[in-house]
Design a protein with these regions (language model features):
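Helix-breaking motifs and short loop linkers at transmembrane-helix boundaries and internal kinks
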Residues: 46, 78, 99-105, 133, ...
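Juxtamembrane intracellular "pre-TM" segments in multi-pass secondary transporters
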Residues: 3-11, 190-220
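C-terminal transmembrane helical hairpin of 12-TM major facilitator-type secondary transporters
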Residues: 280-323
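Helix-loop-helix hairpin linking two adjacent transmembrane segments in secondary transporters
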Residues: 105, 134-135, 139-188
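C-terminal membrane-cytosol helix-exit motif in multi-pass small-molecule transporters
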Residues: 176-196, 383-388
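Helix-to-loop junctions at the C-terminal end of transmembrane segments
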Residues: 67-78, 265-278, 361
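Cytoplasmic helix-loop-helix junction between adjacent transmembrane helices
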Residues: 109-148
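Conserved MFS/SLC helix-loop-helix module at the cytosolic interface between two early adjacent transmembrane helices
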Residues: 65-104
Length: 400
């Protein structure tokens, strides 16, 4: 337990976890609002796919940058203050996106969103670490990861459905309303707790020391490669579904993201399994399942493509449900900074994953996108095997 105090009563913990999850849903919904809209943005602004993808890359890169600041800020100022303040401020650029007059203006506003989103995404797990005993932490983190999946699902599906009938600007208005509701819920229901105990410079120094820890570096590498692989598939999926032989409409493309529902189900299960099975083994299992899903998407059938996406989601969120709690438990100090670094590497991977595969798409089509995703998953598996395992287990494996 941290200095935040004892674990809250069950009723309070339930309400607080609900508010934490609601804020997480709002933050992730804002992050992914443009993903199903890329063909629509390409048509309106006359952009090739890789350029339209900057509306995703900009927010993801800004999240990576913002994550470096959010963790130490939460260590110094308090988790609740950073989360509620960030989510409240996020309403402003989200509303402004609905009024953007050019694509560069939209990209700049998306970057502003990205700087604020880590105030929730990079701090939520650290807040859970302050308020839950170790035996309950992985389950709580699983709930937060499930909320992130729900937010991604809401952002993608709702924005596509709204845009099809009311235009892409209306999707940002909906996102702003969801964000405001999340900020209010967090402000009312989260106990303050976890009073700041480290000055800014001390918190930043603690975060930087994590970069010398082999096992934490393994967790950061896993985060980078995992999200690269995942966002590569889902960023360029709309182009594949809009092209022959499928030729799907924007709302039909958005409905393909309903496979995210599987992530909502699997994340808490993976968190509970990690209390009985070594997290490193479950991470590898998740990566293997993800690779299988990506391979299946290469089939020419729409049904098999959707099945592959479903398998990919199950594998991705099996591994992702374990990564943040692994980092939180491995870090010996500045846990907010450790979680922030995990998110920073995660979104740096997402930045490259939302842009680089666009070049592969232009040259090799979907096979190029799937190939880059599979390479990233292989690199993630190597990081788990050689960096994440405890020292004794690693020596045993090398001796064998």
């Amino acid at each position: 337990m941290s200095a935040a105090g004892p674990t809250p009563p069950v009723r309070l913990a339930s309400r607080a976890t609900g508010a934490l999850c609601a804020g997480t849903v709002a933050a992730y919904a804002a992050m992914y609002v443009t993903q199903p809209l890329l063909p629509m943005l390409s048509a309106e602004f006359g952009l090739p796919p890789a350029t339209a993808g900057l509306s995703v890359s900009a927010v993801v890169l800004a999240i990576a940058v913002g994550s470096f600041l959010a963790g130490p800020l939460s260590d110094a100022l308090g988790r609740k203050a950073v989360m509620v303040g960030s989510l409240a401020l996020l309403v402003l650029p989200t509303l402004a996106c609905a009024m953007a007059r050019s694509f560069p203006e939209l990209v700049a506003l998306r970057a502003a969103q990205g700087l604020l989103i880590p105030g929730v995404t990079a701090v939520a797990v650290a807040w859970a670490g302050d308020h839950y005993a170790p035996g309950r932490l992985r389950t709580a983190v699983g709930a937060v990861i499930a909320a992130s999946v729900a937010g991604g699902l809401l952002g993608r599906v709702a924005s596509g459905l709204v845009a099809e009938h009311a235009g892409w600007r209306a999707a940002f208005l909906l996102s702003a309303a969801v964000t405001a509701a999340g900020a209010i819920g967090m402000g009312l229901e989260l106990p303050r707790g976890g009073t700041p105990g480290a000055p800014w410079r001390g918190a930043l120094g603690g975060m930087l020391r994590h970069l010398r820890d082999r096992r934490l570096l393994g967790g950061f590498a896993l985060a980078f490669c995992l999200f690269f692989a995942f966002i590569a598939v889902f960023t360029y999926l709309p182009y594949r579904l809009a092209a022959p032989p499928f030729r799907l409409s924007t709302d039909a493309i958005a409905s393909a993201y309903l496979v995210y529902v599987a992530g909502i189900a699997v994340s808490p299960v993976a968190g509970r399994l990690a209390t009985r099975v070594a997290p490193e083994r479950l991470m590898l299992a998740g990566l293997a399942i993800s690779a299988l899903g990506v391979a299946v998407t290469l089939a020419g059938s729409l049904a098999l493509l959707v099945a592959g996406l479903l398998v990919l989601v199950v594998g991705m969120f099996t591994a992702q449900a374990l990564g943040p709690s692994y980092v939180n438990e491995t870090a010996r100090e500045a846990k907010g900074g450790a979680n922030a670094l995990y998110l920073a590497f995660y979104y740096l991977g997402g930045t490259l994953g939302s842009w680089l595969p666009g070049l592969a798409w232009q040259r090799w089509g979907w096979a190029g996108v799937a190939g880059t995703s599979l390479l990233a998953l292989g690199a993630a598996a190597l990081a788990v095997v050689f960096l994440c395992r405890p020292e004794g287990a690693l020596r045993h494996a090398q001796g064998a």
